[in-house]
Amino acid sequence: MNLIPTVIETTNRGERAYDIYSRLLKDRIIMLGSQIDDNVANSIVSQLLFLQAQDSEKDIYLYINSPGGSVTAGFAIYDTIQHIKPDVQTICIGMAASMGSFLLAAGAKGKRFALPNAEVMIHQPLGGAQGQATEIEIAANHILKTREKLNRILSERTGQSIEKIQKDTDRDNFLTAEEAKEYGLIDEVMVPETK
């Protein structure tokens, strides 16, 4: 059972109950906290477009705790982040794996973060093909083109060579927050303020 917390705000006009995600959206915060599929992508894209329409100058904050998911759904989010005018700050909490790590790197340069104990995992796209030989060949060619595109974009976003990206994504490659910074996937590890 998936419980979504409710926040109650009191104003001079009375009380109003929000689900937590709607309340965070008021502060320009979007939470990607699940596997990425078409429904999740449509929700994230809609929120990005809404926040741009509300104020095209203020930054948007995308918090990521995701195991990854659909490449095409992830590209929908990635392209929207690149398309809209406001800078999108990306913050990894917990884990940004696979397409989650790709979206973490998609944030505005200088505004990509991870919390100290967060993990990042990069790898090549996964695919499965079945059917006749020609169908398998078509699927294999498609996944190779997708891998080339992902590697090229990751190279641009991290400053690593395409050859290094190919080698490092050949298998699941887990990075600490500090290693993700050294690799160029993020710009800073967020250190908690002393209390």
Curated annotation (Swiss-Prot):
The active site is at S98, H123. It catalyses: Hydrolysis of proteins to small peptides in the presence of ATP and magnesium. alpha-casein is the usual test substrate. In the absence of ATP, only oligopeptides shorter than five residues are hydrolyzed (such as succinyl-Leu-Tyr-|-NHMec, and Leu-Tyr-Leu-|-Tyr-Trp, in which cleavage of the -Tyr-|-Leu- and -Tyr-|-Trp bonds also occurs). Its EC number is 3.4.21.92. GO terms for biological process: protein quality control for misfolded or incompletely synthesized proteins. It is found in: Cytoplasm. GO terms for molecular function: ATP-dependent peptidase activity; ATPase binding; identical protein binding; serine-type endopeptidase activity. Keywords: Cytoplasm, Hydrolase, Protease, Serine protease. InterPro entries: ClpP, ClpP/crotonase-like_dom_sf, ClpP/TepA, ClpP_His_AS, ClpP_Ser_AS. Its main location: cytoplasm. One of its GO terms (cellular component) is cytoplasm. Signal peptide: none annotated. Cleaves peptides in various proteins in a process that requires ATP hydrolysis. Has a chymotrypsin-like activity. Plays a major role in the degradation of misfolded proteins. Belongs to the peptidase S14 family. Fourteen ClpP subunits assemble into 2 heptameric rings which stack back to back to give a disk-like structure with a central cavity, resembling the structure of eukaryotic proteasomes. This is ATP-dependent Clp protease proteolytic subunit.
